[in-house]
């Protein structure tokens, strides 16, 4: 994990989960020139009521063909010398910390990058959720666990012989330009997933909380019959 002194206070994560949402956080970042913070719109919550707020543990996936040996020490074997077709995936999973989000990109979306057993391990470790640039599987099992997962949807084909993790706790970038560094804040809800740069997370959360209060005031003005044009002229909120 990134240096704990650099991370957003965990109490602020609770505020994000209970008081904020991706739309307002995205608006606040747009206003500050952070305009590529949403992940691709294909990445959606497994269930509409799932919410994620946690620190990024970025994971880099790569396509492969067949059960090939790893390209880095420890990639090709698991404990006891057993062949490990997943590269560094199991190691990355075991190193998840409390409030971290397993967030993965790099491969092509033709196999599942997440499943029930991974969710079980992550939940046991206190992780905040998983976000994958591809599919998940074992949907019913994940629902029973209640572990937040965001993906392209459900597709049972395994990543074994098709993809492997080649690095983790490293910077990653999604196809739409969104960059994720270790310790960035990942927020996901029914409207999508975004990344808040670690160095500006406290500033962004504070501004978003203020904007939520302003939006509530605007809602009351609209209910009283004021025009949206007039309201926007007074508040700059819409």
Feature locations, PLM:
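Structural motif
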Residues: 26, 36-37, 55-58, 100-103, ...
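Acidic, glycine-rich flexible loop/linker segments
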Residues: 154-231
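Conserved active-site and cofactor/substrate-binding residues in soluble primary-metabolism enzymes
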Residues: 20-24, 54, 84-87, 91, ...
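Extracellular/luminal Protease-associated
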Residues: 91-119, 123-133
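Ligand/cofactor pocket segment of small-molecule handling proteins
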Residues: 120-124, 128-157
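A short secondary-structure junction signal
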Residues: 113-117, 133-134, 142-144, 161-162, ...
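Intrinsically disordered, low-complexity regions enriched in acidic/Ser/Thr/Pro/Gln residues
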Residues: 1-92, 101, 220-226, 233-237
């Amino acid at each position: 994990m990134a240096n704990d002194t650099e991370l957003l206070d965990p109490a602020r994560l609770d505020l994000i989960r209970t008081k904020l949402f991706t739309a307002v956080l995205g608006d606040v970042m747009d206003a500050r020139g952070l305009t590529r913070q949403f992940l691709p719109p294909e990445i959606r919550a497994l269930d509409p009521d799932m919410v994620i707020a946690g620190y990024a543990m970025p994971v880099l996936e790569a396509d492969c063909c067949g059960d090939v040996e790893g390209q880095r020490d420890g990639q090709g074997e698991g404990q006891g010398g057993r062949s490990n077709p997943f590269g560094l995936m199991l190691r990355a999973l075991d190193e998840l910390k409390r409030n971290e989000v397993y967030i993965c990109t790099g491969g092509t979306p033709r196999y599942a990058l997440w499943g029930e057993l991974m969710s079980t391990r992550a939940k046991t470790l206190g992780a905040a959720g998983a976000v994958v640039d591809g599919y998940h599987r074992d949907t019913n099992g994940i629902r029973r666990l209640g572990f937040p997962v965001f993906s392209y949807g459900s597709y049972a084909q395994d990543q074994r012989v098709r993809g492997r993790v080649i690095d983790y706790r490293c910077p990653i970038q999604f196809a739409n330009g969104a960059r994720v560094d270790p310790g960035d804040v990942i927020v996901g809800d029914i409207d999508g997933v975004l990344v808040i740069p670690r160095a500006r997370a406290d500033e962004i959360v504070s501004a978003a909380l203020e904007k939520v209060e302003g939006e509530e005031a605007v809602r009351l003005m609209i209910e009283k019959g004021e025009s949206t044009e007039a309201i926007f002229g007074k508040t700059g909120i819409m």
